[in-house]
Protein backbone atom coordinates (compact mmCIF):
# COMPACT_ATOMS: atom_id res chain seq x y z
CA UNK A 1 0.00 0.00 0.00
CA UNK A 2 2.85 2.37 0.83
CA UNK A 3 4.35 1.75 -2.58
CA UNK A 4 1.02 2.49 -4.27
CA UNK A 5 0.71 5.77 -2.35
CA UNK A 6 4.25 6.68 -3.41
CA UNK A 7 3.43 5.91 -7.03
CA UNK A 8 0.22 7.95 -6.88
CA UNK A 9 2.00 10.89 -5.31
CA UNK A 10 4.74 10.77 -7.92
CA UNK A 11 2.28 10.68 -10.79
CA UNK A 12 0.47 13.74 -9.39
CA UNK A 13 3.76 15.61 -9.16
CA UNK A 14 4.63 14.66 -12.73
CA UNK A 15 1.21 15.68 -13.96
CA UNK A 16 1.56 19.00 -12.14
CA UNK A 17 4.94 19.59 -13.72
CA UNK A 18 3.59 18.92 -17.19
CA UNK A 19 0.56 21.11 -16.58
CA UNK A 20 2.73 24.02 -15.49
CA UNK A 21 4.40 24.07 -18.88
CA UNK A 22 7.68 22.46 -17.77
CA UNK A 23 9.48 20.27 -20.31
CA UNK A 24 8.77 16.61 -19.38
CA UNK A 25 12.34 15.26 -19.47
CA UNK A 26 13.77 18.31 -17.63
CA UNK A 27 10.95 19.30 -15.31
CA UNK A 28 10.04 15.81 -14.09
CA UNK A 29 12.40 12.90 -13.78
CA UNK A 30 10.42 10.39 -11.70
CA UNK A 31 12.09 7.40 -10.06
CA UNK A 32 10.12 4.91 -7.99
CA UNK A 33 11.61 2.25 -5.76
CA UNK A 34 10.45 0.18 -2.80
CA UNK A 35 14.05 -0.60 -1.75
CA UNK A 36 17.14 1.42 -0.97
CA UNK A 37 18.72 3.01 -4.04
CA UNK A 38 22.07 1.41 -4.83
CA UNK A 39 24.77 2.35 -7.31
CA UNK A 40 27.50 0.24 -8.83
CA UNK A 41 30.87 1.26 -7.41
CA UNK A 42 33.70 1.67 -9.91
CA UNK A 43 37.32 0.77 -9.11
CA UNK A 44 40.64 1.34 -10.86
CA UNK A 45 42.69 -1.07 -8.73
CA UNK A 46 41.59 -4.74 -8.70
CA UNK A 47 43.22 -5.29 -5.30
CA UNK A 48 41.02 -2.55 -3.83
CA UNK A 49 37.97 -4.28 -5.33
CA UNK A 50 38.66 -7.58 -3.53
CA UNK A 51 40.74 -6.66 -0.47
CA UNK A 52 37.80 -7.15 1.91
CA UNK A 53 37.28 -10.79 0.89
CA UNK A 54 38.05 -12.51 4.21
CA UNK A 55 39.74 -15.82 4.94
CA UNK A 56 37.26 -18.68 4.66
CA UNK A 57 34.93 -16.88 2.24
CA UNK A 58 32.88 -18.64 -0.43
CA UNK A 59 33.78 -17.15 -3.81
CA UNK A 60 32.00 -17.87 -7.09
CA UNK A 61 34.47 -17.61 -9.99
CA UNK A 62 33.17 -17.37 -13.55
CA UNK A 63 34.54 -18.96 -16.69
CA UNK A 64 34.70 -22.29 -18.50
CA UNK A 65 38.20 -23.66 -18.80
CA UNK A 66 40.17 -20.48 -19.49
CA UNK A 67 37.36 -18.84 -21.46
CA UNK A 68 35.82 -15.89 -19.67
CA UNK A 69 37.86 -16.10 -16.47
CA UNK A 70 38.37 -12.94 -14.36
CA UNK A 71 42.14 -12.79 -14.85
CA UNK A 72 42.76 -9.49 -13.08
CA UNK A 73 40.64 -10.33 -10.04
CA UNK A 74 42.31 -13.73 -9.63
CA UNK A 75 45.71 -12.01 -9.74
CA UNK A 76 44.44 -9.56 -7.12
CA UNK A 77 43.56 -12.43 -4.77
CA UNK A 78 47.12 -13.72 -5.15
CA UNK A 79 48.33 -10.32 -3.93
CA UNK A 80 45.94 -10.11 -0.96
CA UNK A 81 47.01 -13.57 0.21
CA UNK A 82 43.52 -14.49 1.44
CA UNK A 83 43.39 -18.12 2.65
CA UNK A 84 40.95 -20.96 3.23
CA UNK A 85 38.66 -20.09 0.33
CA UNK A 86 35.79 -22.22 -0.91
CA UNK A 87 35.93 -21.64 -4.66
CA UNK A 88 32.84 -22.47 -6.71
CA UNK A 89 33.86 -22.76 -10.36
CA UNK A 90 33.21 -25.22 -13.15
CA UNK A 91 36.89 -26.12 -13.16
CA UNK A 92 40.16 -24.66 -11.93
CA UNK A 93 41.93 -23.44 -15.03
CA UNK A 94 45.33 -25.01 -15.67
CA UNK A 95 48.38 -25.49 -13.46
CA UNK A 96 49.87 -22.05 -14.15
CA UNK A 97 46.87 -19.90 -15.08
CA UNK A 98 43.42 -19.03 -13.78
CA UNK A 99 42.35 -20.61 -10.51
CA UNK A 100 45.28 -22.98 -10.87
CA UNK A 101 47.41 -20.12 -9.53
CA UNK A 102 45.38 -19.99 -6.30
CA UNK A 103 45.60 -23.77 -5.97
CA UNK A 104 49.37 -23.61 -6.35
CA UNK A 105 49.61 -20.91 -3.66
CA UNK A 106 47.40 -23.06 -1.35
CA UNK A 107 44.79 -20.32 -0.93
CA UNK A 108 41.86 -22.63 -1.71
CA UNK A 109 40.59 -25.09 0.90
CA UNK A 110 37.65 -26.52 -1.07
CA UNK A 111 36.70 -26.58 -4.75
CA UNK A 112 33.08 -27.03 -5.82
CA UNK A 113 33.44 -28.05 -9.46
CA UNK A 114 32.25 -30.41 -12.16
CA UNK A 115 35.55 -31.14 -13.84
CA UNK A 116 39.16 -31.58 -12.76
CA UNK A 117 40.22 -32.03 -16.35
CA UNK A 118 43.86 -31.73 -17.26
CA UNK A 119 44.89 -29.64 -14.24
CA UNK A 120 47.50 -32.00 -12.80
CA UNK A 121 48.01 -29.94 -9.64
CA UNK A 122 44.26 -29.94 -8.95
CA UNK A 123 44.16 -33.74 -9.26
CA UNK A 124 47.36 -34.19 -7.21
CA UNK A 125 46.15 -32.05 -4.30
CA UNK A 126 42.79 -33.83 -4.28
CA UNK A 127 44.16 -37.39 -4.34
CA UNK A 128 46.84 -36.57 -1.74
CA UNK A 129 44.31 -35.12 0.71
CA UNK A 130 45.55 -31.52 0.50
CA UNK A 131 42.36 -30.19 -1.10
CA UNK A 132 38.65 -30.80 -0.55
CA UNK A 133 36.74 -31.27 -3.80
CA UNK A 134 32.96 -31.40 -4.08
CA UNK A 135 32.39 -32.79 -7.57
CA UNK A 136 29.00 -31.74 -8.90
CA UNK A 137 27.40 -32.42 -12.30
CA UNK A 138 27.91 -29.37 -14.50
CA UNK A 139 24.23 -28.71 -15.15
CA UNK A 140 23.38 -29.21 -11.49
CA UNK A 141 26.15 -26.78 -10.55
CA UNK A 142 24.78 -24.17 -12.97
CA UNK A 143 21.22 -24.67 -11.70
CA UNK A 144 22.26 -24.56 -8.03
CA UNK A 145 23.89 -21.19 -8.72
CA UNK A 146 20.90 -19.96 -10.73
CA UNK A 147 18.54 -21.04 -7.94
CA UNK A 148 20.68 -19.26 -5.36
CA UNK A 149 20.42 -16.02 -7.28
CA UNK A 150 16.67 -16.45 -7.72
CA UNK A 151 15.96 -17.08 -4.04
CA UNK A 152 14.99 -20.73 -4.59
CA UNK A 153 16.47 -22.80 -1.74
CA UNK A 154 16.39 -26.20 -3.47
CA UNK A 155 15.04 -28.07 -6.49
CA UNK A 156 14.58 -31.60 -7.85
CA UNK A 157 16.59 -32.85 -10.82
CA UNK A 158 16.90 -36.22 -12.58
CA UNK A 159 20.66 -35.72 -12.92
CA UNK A 160 22.71 -38.05 -10.75
CA UNK A 161 19.98 -40.48 -9.75
CA UNK A 162 21.45 -43.95 -9.17
CA UNK A 163 25.01 -42.56 -8.90
CA UNK A 164 27.28 -41.55 -6.03
CA UNK A 165 25.75 -38.08 -6.25
CA UNK A 166 22.43 -39.52 -5.06
CA UNK A 167 23.74 -42.37 -2.92
CA UNK A 168 26.46 -40.39 -1.14
CA UNK A 169 29.94 -41.62 -0.42
CA UNK A 170 31.79 -39.73 -3.15
CA UNK A 171 35.17 -38.69 -1.69
CA UNK A 172 35.35 -34.99 -0.86
CA UNK A 173 38.64 -35.32 1.00
CA UNK A 174 41.17 -38.15 1.18
CA UNK A 175 43.48 -39.01 4.06
CA UNK A 176 47.15 -39.25 3.19
CA UNK A 177 46.90 -43.05 3.23
CA UNK A 178 44.24 -42.93 0.50
CA UNK A 179 41.25 -43.61 2.75
CA UNK A 180 38.27 -41.25 2.63
CA UNK A 181 38.26 -38.52 5.27
CA UNK A 182 35.11 -36.68 4.14
CA UNK A 183 32.42 -38.21 1.91
CA UNK A 184 29.42 -36.64 0.22
CA UNK A 185 26.01 -37.04 1.82
CA UNK A 186 23.11 -38.88 0.15
CA UNK A 187 20.35 -36.88 -1.53
CA UNK A 188 16.63 -37.06 -0.90
CA UNK A 189 14.78 -38.89 -3.72
CA UNK A 190 11.23 -38.36 -4.99
CA UNK A 191 9.32 -39.77 -7.91
CA UNK A 192 7.39 -37.60 -10.36
CA UNK A 193 5.46 -39.10 -13.28
CA UNK A 194 7.32 -42.38 -12.98
CA UNK A 195 10.82 -40.84 -13.00
CA UNK A 196 13.18 -40.45 -10.05
CA UNK A 197 14.54 -37.05 -9.05
CA UNK A 198 17.01 -35.98 -6.37
CA UNK A 199 16.94 -32.86 -4.22
CA UNK A 200 19.76 -30.38 -4.72
CA UNK A 201 20.32 -27.27 -2.62
CA UNK A 202 21.05 -23.82 -4.02
CA UNK A 203 24.51 -22.26 -3.95
CA UNK A 204 25.20 -18.66 -2.98
CA UNK A 205 28.51 -16.92 -2.44
CA UNK A 206 29.91 -14.21 -0.24
CA UNK A 207 31.53 -12.80 -3.38
CA UNK A 208 31.32 -13.48 -7.12
CA UNK A 209 34.23 -12.69 -9.43
CA UNK A 210 32.91 -12.29 -12.96
CA UNK A 211 34.43 -11.52 -16.35
CA UNK A 212 32.33 -9.64 -18.91
CA UNK A 213 33.10 -7.88 -22.17
CA UNK A 214 31.69 -4.39 -21.69
CA UNK A 215 29.81 -2.39 -19.08
CA UNK A 216 28.18 1.01 -19.19
CA UNK A 217 28.57 3.63 -16.48
CA UNK A 218 25.29 2.58 -14.91
CA UNK A 219 26.68 -0.91 -14.31
CA UNK A 220 24.82 -2.79 -17.03
CA UNK A 221 26.89 -5.61 -18.52
CA UNK A 222 27.20 -7.59 -21.76
CA UNK A 223 29.24 -10.70 -22.52
CA UNK A 224 31.02 -11.82 -25.67
CA UNK A 225 30.38 -15.12 -27.48
CA UNK A 226 30.89 -18.27 -25.38
CA UNK A 227 32.50 -16.31 -22.52
CA UNK A 228 29.02 -15.96 -21.02
CA UNK A 229 29.07 -19.52 -19.53
CA UNK A 230 28.94 -19.52 -15.69
CA UNK A 231 29.57 -15.78 -15.47
CA UNK A 232 25.93 -14.86 -16.01
CA UNK A 233 24.26 -16.94 -13.25
CA UNK A 234 27.11 -16.17 -10.84
CA UNK A 235 26.44 -12.43 -11.20
CA UNK A 236 23.13 -12.95 -9.43
CA UNK A 237 24.12 -15.39 -6.68
CA UNK A 238 26.50 -13.51 -4.37
CA UNK A 239 26.22 -10.93 -1.63
CA UNK A 240 28.82 -8.88 -3.48
CA UNK A 241 29.41 -9.25 -7.22
CA UNK A 242 32.65 -7.87 -8.63
CA UNK A 243 32.75 -7.64 -12.43
CA UNK A 244 35.83 -6.96 -14.53
CA UNK A 245 35.37 -5.84 -18.14
CA UNK A 246 37.51 -5.01 -21.14
CA UNK A 247 35.75 -1.73 -21.85
CA UNK A 248 33.50 0.77 -20.07
CA UNK A 249 31.14 2.80 -22.25
CA UNK A 250 28.74 5.67 -21.71
CA UNK A 251 25.17 5.16 -20.57
CA UNK A 252 22.99 4.70 -23.63
CA UNK A 253 25.66 2.91 -25.67
CA UNK A 254 23.76 -0.37 -25.19
CA UNK A 255 20.25 -0.83 -26.48
CA UNK A 256 18.19 -1.87 -23.44
CA UNK A 257 17.21 -5.15 -25.10
CA UNK A 258 20.89 -6.04 -25.63
CA UNK A 259 21.87 -5.92 -21.95
CA UNK A 260 22.72 -9.36 -20.53
CA UNK A 261 23.02 -8.40 -16.85
CA UNK A 262 21.11 -5.39 -15.48
CA UNK A 263 22.94 -3.07 -13.10
CA UNK A 264 20.97 -4.29 -10.07
CA UNK A 265 23.20 -7.39 -9.87
CA UNK A 266 26.53 -5.57 -10.20
CA UNK A 267 28.02 -4.12 -7.01
CA UNK A 268 31.59 -3.41 -8.04
CA UNK A 269 33.07 -2.89 -11.48
CA UNK A 270 36.59 -2.53 -12.80
CA UNK A 271 38.18 -2.22 -16.21
CA UNK A 272 40.84 -4.92 -16.47
CA UNK A 273 44.35 -3.53 -16.88
CA UNK A 274 45.54 -6.32 -19.19
CA UNK A 275 44.24 -9.58 -20.60
CA UNK A 276 46.27 -12.55 -21.74
CA UNK A 277 43.10 -14.46 -22.76
CA UNK A 278 45.07 -17.67 -23.06
CA UNK A 279 43.65 -20.41 -25.30
CA UNK A 280 43.71 -23.82 -23.63
CA UNK A 281 43.44 -25.91 -26.80
CA UNK A 282 44.22 -24.14 -30.04
CA UNK A 283 42.63 -26.31 -32.73
CA UNK A 284 43.22 -25.08 -36.28
CA UNK A 285 41.83 -26.12 -39.65
CA UNK A 286 44.78 -25.76 -42.00
CA UNK A 287 44.52 -24.21 -45.43
CA UNK A 288 44.15 -26.85 -48.10
CA UNK A 289 42.58 -29.43 -45.82
CA UNK A 290 40.45 -31.80 -47.82
CA UNK A 291 38.04 -34.38 -46.51
CA UNK A 292 37.97 -34.68 -42.75
CA UNK A 293 40.07 -37.48 -41.32
CA UNK A 294 40.17 -39.28 -38.02
CA UNK A 295 42.63 -37.98 -35.44
CA UNK A 296 45.21 -40.67 -36.24
CA UNK A 297 45.57 -41.43 -39.95
CA UNK A 298 45.71 -45.21 -40.41
CA UNK A 299 43.95 -45.93 -37.14
CA UNK A 300 41.41 -48.29 -38.67
CA UNK A 301 39.77 -49.16 -35.36
CA UNK A 302 38.87 -45.57 -34.46
CA UNK A 303 37.89 -44.68 -38.01
CA UNK A 304 35.59 -47.69 -38.16
CA UNK A 305 33.75 -46.52 -35.04
CA UNK A 306 33.64 -42.93 -36.28
CA UNK A 307 32.17 -43.85 -39.66
CA UNK A 308 29.47 -45.96 -38.01
CA UNK A 309 28.68 -43.28 -35.45
CA UNK A 310 28.15 -40.73 -38.24
CA UNK A 311 25.13 -42.74 -39.41
CA UNK A 312 23.31 -41.81 -36.18
CA UNK A 313 22.82 -38.23 -37.38
CA UNK A 314 19.48 -37.27 -38.93
CA UNK A 315 18.35 -34.17 -40.77
CA UNK A 316 17.26 -31.36 -38.45
CA UNK A 317 18.61 -33.09 -35.35
CA UNK A 318 20.00 -31.26 -32.32
CA UNK A 319 23.03 -33.15 -31.01
CA UNK A 320 25.62 -32.86 -28.26
CA UNK A 321 28.91 -34.66 -28.90
CA UNK A 322 31.58 -35.64 -26.41
CA UNK A 323 35.26 -35.10 -27.12
CA UNK A 324 37.18 -37.71 -29.07
CA UNK A 325 35.34 -40.15 -31.33
CA UNK A 326 31.89 -38.48 -31.03
CA UNK A 327 33.20 -35.07 -32.10
CA UNK A 328 35.26 -36.62 -34.89
CA UNK A 329 32.10 -38.30 -36.18
CA UNK A 330 30.70 -34.84 -36.96
CA UNK A 331 33.36 -34.55 -39.69
CA UNK A 332 31.48 -37.23 -41.62
CA UNK A 333 27.99 -35.74 -41.42
CA UNK A 334 26.41 -36.03 -44.86
CA UNK A 335 26.30 -32.73 -46.78
CA UNK A 336 22.69 -33.57 -47.61
CA UNK A 337 21.51 -33.12 -44.02
CA UNK A 338 21.67 -30.38 -41.38
CA UNK A 339 22.64 -31.24 -37.81
CA UNK A 340 22.67 -28.53 -35.14
CA UNK A 341 25.55 -29.15 -32.73
CA UNK A 342 25.04 -27.96 -29.16
CA UNK A 343 27.91 -27.41 -26.73
CA UNK A 344 27.19 -27.34 -23.00
CA UNK A 345 29.36 -24.27 -22.41
CA UNK A 346 26.71 -22.20 -24.21
CA UNK A 347 26.77 -22.56 -28.00
CA UNK A 348 24.16 -23.83 -30.45
CA UNK A 349 25.32 -24.07 -34.05
CA UNK A 350 28.95 -25.16 -33.78
CA UNK A 351 30.98 -25.08 -36.97
CA UNK A 352 34.38 -26.53 -37.89
CA UNK A 353 37.71 -25.61 -36.35
CA UNK A 354 38.85 -22.09 -37.33
CA UNK A 355 41.62 -21.07 -39.69
CA UNK A 356 44.64 -19.65 -37.88
CA UNK A 357 43.45 -16.05 -38.22
CA UNK A 358 39.93 -16.92 -37.02
CA UNK A 359 40.91 -18.44 -33.65
CA UNK A 360 39.16 -16.58 -30.82
CA UNK A 361 39.71 -17.12 -27.08
CA UNK A 362 36.05 -16.24 -26.48
CA UNK A 363 34.76 -18.95 -28.81
CA UNK A 364 35.40 -22.52 -27.68
CA UNK A 365 33.54 -25.82 -27.41
CA UNK A 366 33.05 -28.00 -24.33
CA UNK A 367 36.45 -29.61 -24.97
CA UNK A 368 38.04 -26.13 -24.63
CA UNK A 369 38.99 -26.21 -28.32
CA UNK A 370 38.75 -23.16 -30.56
CA UNK A 371 35.79 -23.43 -32.93
CA UNK A 372 33.67 -21.43 -35.35
CA UNK A 373 29.91 -21.08 -35.60
CA UNK A 374 27.50 -21.48 -38.48
CA UNK A 375 24.90 -18.95 -39.68
CA UNK A 376 21.94 -19.01 -37.31
CA UNK A 377 24.04 -19.93 -34.27
CA UNK A 378 23.40 -18.55 -30.79
CA UNK A 379 25.21 -18.06 -27.48
CA UNK A 380 23.75 -18.46 -23.99
CA UNK A 381 24.72 -19.09 -20.37
CA UNK A 382 25.51 -22.44 -18.76
CA UNK A 383 22.21 -22.63 -16.88
CA UNK A 384 20.31 -22.02 -20.14
CA UNK A 385 22.40 -24.67 -21.89
CA UNK A 386 21.51 -27.32 -19.34
CA UNK A 387 17.85 -26.36 -19.44
CA UNK A 388 18.03 -27.48 -23.09
CA UNK A 389 19.83 -30.68 -22.11
CA UNK A 390 17.93 -31.67 -18.98
CA UNK A 391 14.63 -30.67 -20.56
CA UNK A 392 15.05 -33.15 -23.42
CA UNK A 393 15.38 -30.58 -26.19
CA UNK A 394 18.59 -32.23 -27.44
CA UNK A 395 17.75 -35.21 -29.66
CA UNK A 396 21.05 -37.08 -29.44
CA UNK A 397 24.01 -37.22 -27.12
CA UNK A 398 27.06 -39.24 -28.11
CA UNK A 399 29.86 -39.89 -25.63
CA UNK A 400 32.61 -42.29 -24.65
CA UNK A 401 32.68 -44.77 -21.78
CA UNK A 402 34.94 -46.77 -19.51
CA UNK A 403 32.19 -49.33 -18.87
CA UNK A 404 28.61 -50.00 -19.98
CA UNK A 405 26.36 -52.58 -18.34
CA UNK A 406 23.99 -55.03 -19.98
CA UNK A 407 21.03 -52.84 -19.05
CA UNK A 408 22.53 -49.52 -20.09
CA UNK A 409 24.29 -48.26 -16.97
CA UNK A 410 27.17 -45.96 -17.90
CA UNK A 411 30.49 -45.32 -16.11
CA UNK A 412 32.93 -42.79 -17.55
CA UNK A 413 34.05 -40.25 -14.96
CA UNK A 414 36.35 -41.69 -12.30
CA UNK A 415 38.49 -44.56 -11.05
CA UNK A 416 38.40 -44.16 -7.25
CA UNK A 417 41.76 -43.25 -5.74
CA UNK A 418 43.55 -43.32 -9.11
CA UNK A 419 42.01 -41.17 -11.83
CA UNK A 420 39.56 -38.35 -11.28
CA UNK A 421 38.54 -36.18 -14.22
CA UNK A 422 35.08 -35.33 -12.93
CA UNK A 423 31.72 -35.93 -14.53
CA UNK A 424 31.51 -32.57 -16.30
CA UNK A 425 28.19 -32.41 -18.12
CA UNK A 426 27.90 -36.15 -18.76
CA UNK A 427 25.46 -36.91 -15.93
CA UNK A 428 23.14 -34.18 -17.18
CA UNK A 429 23.46 -35.27 -20.81
CA UNK A 430 22.22 -38.79 -20.03
CA UNK A 431 19.49 -37.73 -17.57
CA UNK A 432 16.65 -37.00 -20.00
CA UNK A 433 14.51 -39.91 -21.18
CA UNK A 434 13.75 -37.88 -24.33
CA UNK A 435 17.37 -37.88 -25.50
CA UNK A 436 18.91 -40.82 -27.37
CA UNK A 437 22.21 -41.78 -25.72
CA UNK A 438 24.81 -43.44 -27.96
CA UNK A 439 28.11 -44.70 -26.54
CA UNK A 440 31.12 -44.95 -28.85
CA UNK A 441 34.17 -46.82 -27.57
CA UNK A 442 36.68 -49.55 -28.27
CA UNK A 443 35.21 -52.93 -27.39
CA UNK A 444 37.83 -53.89 -24.79
CA UNK A 445 40.16 -52.09 -22.39
CA UNK A 446 43.89 -52.67 -22.08
CA UNK A 447 44.73 -56.31 -21.53
CA UNK A 448 41.43 -57.26 -23.20
CA UNK A 449 39.50 -56.39 -20.04
CA UNK A 450 35.75 -56.22 -20.61
CA UNK A 451 34.11 -52.82 -21.03
CA UNK A 452 30.64 -54.19 -21.80
CA UNK A 453 29.66 -55.99 -18.60
CA UNK A 454 26.90 -57.62 -16.60
CA UNK A 455 27.31 -54.84 -14.03
CA UNK A 456 29.61 -51.82 -13.96
CA UNK A 457 32.31 -51.94 -11.30
CA UNK A 458 33.21 -48.24 -11.56
CA UNK A 459 31.07 -45.38 -10.18
CA UNK A 460 28.11 -44.73 -12.47
CA UNK A 461 27.53 -41.67 -14.62
CA UNK A 462 23.93 -42.70 -15.32
CA UNK A 463 21.62 -45.60 -14.55
CA UNK A 464 19.90 -47.44 -17.43
CA UNK A 465 20.51 -44.49 -19.72
CA UNK A 466 22.34 -45.90 -22.79
CA UNK A 467 20.29 -46.67 -25.91
CA UNK A 468 23.00 -47.88 -28.29
CA UNK A 469 26.65 -49.04 -28.13
CA UNK A 470 29.00 -48.73 -31.12
CA UNK A 471 32.42 -50.42 -31.03
CA UNK A 472 34.88 -51.50 -33.70
CA UNK A 473 33.41 -55.01 -33.54
CA UNK A 474 29.68 -54.55 -33.26
CA UNK A 475 26.61 -52.41 -32.69
CA UNK A 476 24.22 -53.22 -29.82
CA UNK A 477 20.80 -51.87 -29.00
CA UNK A 478 20.11 -51.63 -25.27
CA UNK A 479 16.80 -52.43 -23.58
CA UNK A 480 16.49 -51.41 -19.92
CA UNK A 481 14.69 -54.66 -19.06
CA UNK A 482 15.78 -57.20 -21.68
CA UNK A 483 19.41 -56.17 -22.05
CA UNK A 484 21.60 -56.15 -25.18
CA UNK A 485 20.72 -57.11 -28.74
CA UNK A 486 23.45 -57.45 -31.34
CA UNK A 487 22.21 -55.69 -34.49
CA UNK A 488 25.40 -55.22 -36.56
CA UNK A 489 28.63 -57.21 -36.81
CA UNK A 490 31.96 -56.21 -38.38
CA UNK A 491 32.78 -58.14 -41.51
CA UNK A 492 35.05 -61.12 -40.80
CA UNK A 493 33.94 -61.54 -37.19
CA UNK A 494 31.49 -64.11 -35.84
CA UNK A 495 28.94 -63.81 -33.07
CA UNK A 496 31.16 -66.09 -31.01
CA UNK A 497 34.11 -63.71 -31.49
CA UNK A 498 32.05 -60.87 -30.08
CA UNK A 499 30.73 -62.99 -27.21
CA UNK A 500 34.27 -63.86 -26.10
CA UNK A 501 35.19 -60.18 -25.79
CA UNK A 502 31.92 -59.17 -24.09
CA UNK A 503 31.41 -59.56 -20.34
CA UNK A 504 27.72 -60.46 -20.48
CA UNK A 505 25.30 -62.39 -22.64
CA UNK A 506 23.27 -60.74 -25.40
CA UNK A 507 20.53 -61.55 -27.86
CA UNK A 508 21.15 -61.65 -31.60
CA UNK A 509 18.75 -59.79 -33.86
CA UNK A 510 17.04 -61.94 -36.51
CA UNK A 511 17.90 -59.04 -38.83
CA UNK A 512 21.61 -59.02 -37.96
CA UNK A 513 23.53 -57.18 -40.67
CA UNK A 514 27.13 -56.26 -41.47
CA UNK A 515 28.35 -53.19 -39.59
CA UNK A 516 27.44 -50.12 -41.62
CA UNK A 517 29.87 -47.36 -42.61
CA UNK A 518 29.13 -43.90 -43.93
CA UNK A 519 30.60 -43.20 -47.36
CA UNK A 520 33.58 -40.83 -47.52
UniProtKB/Swiss-Prot annotation:
Effect of residue 270 to K: In SCOTD; uncertain significance
Single GO MF annotation: succinyl-CoA:3-oxo-acid CoA-transferase activity
Main location, first listed in the record: mitochondrion
UniProt keyword list: Disease variant, Lipid metabolism, Mitochondrion, Phosphoprotein, Transferase, Transit peptide
Cellular localisation: Mitochondrion
Residues recorded as bearing N6-succinyllysine in the entry: 185, 418, 421, 455
Entry EC number(s): 2.8.3.5
SUPFAM superfamilies (UniProt xref): NagB/RpiA/CoA transferase-like
Transit peptide endpoints, chain numbering: 1-39
InterPro entries: 3-oxoacid_CoA-transf_A, 3-oxoacid_CoA-transf_B, 3-oxoacid_CoA-transferase, CoA_trans_fam_I, CoA_transf_AS, CoA_transf_BS, NagB/RpiA_transferase-like
Active site per UniProt: 344
UniProt function note: Key enzyme for ketone body catabolism. Catalyzes the first, rate-limiting step of ketone body utilization in extrahepatic tissues, by transferring coenzyme A (CoA) from a donor thiolester species (succinyl-CoA) to an acceptor carboxylate (acetoacetate), and produces acetoacetyl-CoA. Acetoacetyl-CoA is further metabolized by acetoacetyl-CoA thiolase into two acetyl-CoA molecules which enter the citric acid cycle for energy production.
Family: Belongs to the 3-oxoacid CoA-transferase family.
Annotated protein name in UniProt: Succinyl-CoA:3-ketoacid coenzyme A transferase 1, mitochondrial
